[in-house]
């Protein structure tokens, strides 16, 4: 059987699948309060996305506390409990290596707001309605 390698510019199907499984596992662990830290458990944290490196040894976890406040505190607390979170992932998933977890703020909502702002711009609205054609006088 021939070995097919991923040559595209984006993540492979395996990276996407493993990232989604890690995201679900972390979301469940945080939702159930399985990390025994009252400071962490008082925050309602959304795990928006997990991006895995090609070798699946590093997982970058994009998180955002509910309301968008205390982002740095949430990342610091998650980083503090990185080992325990890795342990939960290895119990739920069968991987050759337990990925190193790196926590980053989830900027999806910021990008969404910027996109909405752009679409509400008068010039863009005129282009959308007019099909992008220039006015002729």
From Swiss-Prot:
Alphabetic keyword roster: Cytoplasm, Ribosome biogenesis
Matches recorded under Pfam families: RBFA
Complexes and interactors: Monomer. Binds 30S ribosomal subunits, but not 50S ribosomal subunits or 70S ribosomes.
GO cellular component, one term: cytosol
Source organism (scientific name): Cereibacter sphaeroides (strain KD131 / KCTC 12085) (Rhodobacter sphaeroides)
Family label: Belongs to the RbfA family.
Signal sequence, start to end: none
Name of this protein: Ribosome-binding factor A
Intracellular or extracellular location(s): Cytoplasm
Its job: One of several proteins that assist in the late maturation steps of the functional core of the 30S ribosomal subunit. Associates with free 30S ribosomal subunits (but not with 30S subunits that are part of 70S ribosomes or polysomes). Required for efficient processing of 16S rRNA. May interact with the 5'-terminal helix region of 16S rRNA.
């Amino acid at each position: 059987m021939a070995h097919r390698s991923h040559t595209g510019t984006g993540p492979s199907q395996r990276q996407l699948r493993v990232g989604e499984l890690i995201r679900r596992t972390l979301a469940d662990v945080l939702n159930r309060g399985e990390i025994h830290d009252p400071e962490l458990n008082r925050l309602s944290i959304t795990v928006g996305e997990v991006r895995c490196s090609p070798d699946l040894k590093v997982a970058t976890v994009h998180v955002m506390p509910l309301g968008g406040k205390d982002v740095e505190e949430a990342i610091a607390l998650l980083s503090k409990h990185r080992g325990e979170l890795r342990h939960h992932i290895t119990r739920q998933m069968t991987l050759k290596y337990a990925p190193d977890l790196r926590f980053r703020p989830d900027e999806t909502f910021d990008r969404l707001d910027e996109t909405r702002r752009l679409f509400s711009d008068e010039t863009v609205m005129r282009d959308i309605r007019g099909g992008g054609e220039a006015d002729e006088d």
